[in-house]
Amino acid sequence: MKKNVQIKGTKDGISIFLSDKASISELQQELTQLLADQKQNPYSGEKLEVQVQIGNRLFSEEEELEISTIIHENSQMEISAFYSNVMSKDEAKKWKENDQIFSMATIIRSGQVVQVPGDFLLIGDVNPGGQIRSNGNVFVLGNIKGIIHAGFEGNENAVVAGKFLYPSQVRIADKVYGFDSEDYKEVTETDLFSAFVNDAGEIVIDGIHKIRKIRPEISNFQGGR
């Protein structure tokens, strides 16, 4: 008979595997019994972090608390995280939004803030005082004189592409690059640039061709909204 609760050592440390075929009450009973039977095992000494793998199911906050309480009261193990093979509706919705490309043909004027969860394509200008926030990449077919914030939720792999003009500012995750008038002495009306975070954790401004090299997946992006 297959056990519904197992404790195993993995390359990531100690994991408790809870069968997704068993009810929560069965898991609670078997987990309590297993920990009671192993009072003298290596897991009952010094405190150890443990991951709880729950398979193809989701636990409610109450169920996670019940499992956590059993482990806390019957062992020296502390749960670092619960891991599931499935995602909640909210997580799926957020993933879908972040994977989309939003597009708009307009002028972002002073005081306006446009925020999208995925990649963003603007056909138009960003005036001084205007701002774009995107959790993904930002592409502007127009003049940029305002603020472009790509990867605003912490995505340092995001890039910005467009024609940066004074006094524009580029932000990627928590990095900031501000342009001054000296940056534009040799810029022509047709110059397009890319902005990205390099290996040193700094925003770099380079030619538009650089995107294909540093983010090859972007050259194949499709979509729209």
UniProtKB/Swiss-Prot annotation:
Keyword Cell cycle: yes
Keywords in alphabetical order: Cell cycle, Cell division, Septation
A Pfam family matched in the record: MinC_N_1
GO BP terms, alphabetized: cell morphogenesis; division septum assembly; regulation of cell septum assembly
Function: Cell division inhibitor that blocks the formation of polar Z ring septums. Rapidly oscillates between the poles of the cell to destabilize FtsZ filaments that have formed before they mature into polar Z rings. Prevents FtsZ polymerization.
NCBIfam families with a match to the protein in the record: PRK00513.1-3
Family stated for the protein in its record: Belongs to the MinC family.
Oligomeric and partner information: Interacts with MinD and FtsZ.
Protein name: Probable septum site-determining protein MinC
Species of origin: Listeria monocytogenes serovar 1/2a (strain ATCC BAA-679 / EGD-e)
